[in-house]
Structure formats: C-alpha cells, structure tokens
C-alpha cells in the first residue's frame, strides 16, 4: 500500500493481527511519503496465538519537519519479522521506533531497522525491549546511517532483554555508519537473566 501524507497532514494506522486459523503466511508492505510538517503514527500489534508466519516491511521517506512514529508489540505469531527503512530527506525531520517483544513457546521474532540521515539537523530514536521465555528467540538489528551532508544529526539506539529461561536467545546487532563529523550518535544493548 502507498500512502502520501501532504503538507501539515497526519495519519494514524493501527495494525492488529489476531488470526484464528492455524497456519497463515502474511506479507505486508507499506510505502509512506511524508511531505513538509506531516505526522505519521503506525502501531503494529501481533496477538495471533498460532503457527502464523508474518513479514512486514515499511519504507518511509520524510521531508522537512515531518515526524514518523512506529510502535511494535510482538507476541503472537510463530515467526514474525518487521523491517523498517526510513529516509530522513528534509531538515528537522524525526523518526521514532519503539518495540516490545514478549515471547514464549519457541517463537522467533525479529525487528530490523535502517535509519538514513541524509541532510542536516535530523533526529532518530530507537528503543527495543524484550522479555523471552520457553525457548523463544528475538533478534534486533538496527542501523543508523549518517551521510556526509548530514551534520548535526542526533541518532539514538538501545535494546534491552530479560531472559526468563536458559534456552531463550536474544541477538542484537546495533550498527553506526557515520560519514559526518558534527553528530551525536549512540547505540547500546544489554541482556541477561533475573537473579534467583
């Protein structure tokens, strides 16, 4: 699906997946074009309690002063992968991505993000939190790219995970690719089990 958000417009999309059938493959693609001062809010909630396989891809192109916010709640399907590619093409554009994994029963969920800071004075914020139990696995791969023209970039990325079972697995791959020298970018990841 293609969405064009004109100047000073806003759009809120709430995707709730609660499929009752035993086995499905679901593939979604959204292409968002945000013009000046546009605001996008996208909520992705997966509550399917079955053997579904789901893949979701968002491409977001942002103009000056636009804001995109993506929230992912991931606790349903057997296998789920969310990918977000965001291109900050206008000054003072901002992208915010928040994700929560709450997994059990041998589920495998992934979030992969790529935030591309292409001009000056752009901002991104990514925060992913996970609670894993019963042989489940989650993956977070987040990339912040800063082009040579993207001075004054502010990029932040953090992932945290609590492992409730010794057979769970959390893999984090934070990436920074920076070609400008006047930027503020950081990334971090922490995971561990609770004390007995």
Q: Can you describe what each PLM-predicted range is?
A:
Residues 1-196:
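Conserved beta-strand/loop scaffold segments within soluble protein domains that form the structured core
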């Amino acid at each position: 699906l293609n969405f064009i958000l004109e100047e000073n417009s806003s759009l809120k999309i709430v995707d709730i997946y609660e499929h009752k059938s035993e086995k499905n493959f679901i593939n979604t693609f959204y292409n968002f074009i945000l013009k000046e001062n546009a605001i996008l809010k996208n909520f992705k909630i997966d509550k399917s309690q079955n053997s579904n396989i789901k893949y979701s891809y968002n491409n977001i192109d942002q103009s000056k002063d636009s804001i995109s916010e993506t929230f992912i709640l991931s606790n349903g399907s057997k296998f789920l992968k969310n990918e977000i590619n965001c291109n900050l093409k206008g000054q003072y554009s901002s992208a915010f991505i928040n994700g929560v994994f709450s997994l059990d029963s041998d589920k495998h969920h992934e979030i992969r993000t790529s935030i591309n800071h292409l001009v000056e004075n752009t901002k991104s914020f990514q925060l992913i939190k996970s609670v894993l139990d019963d042989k489940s696995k989650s993956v977070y791969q987040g990339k912040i790219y800063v082009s040579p023209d993207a001075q004054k970039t502010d990029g932040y990325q953090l992932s945290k995970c609590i492992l409730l079972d010794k057979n769970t697995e959390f893999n984090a791959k934070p990436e920074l690719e920076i070609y400008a020298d006047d930027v503020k970018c950081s990334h971090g990841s922490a995971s561990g089990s609770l004390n007995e």
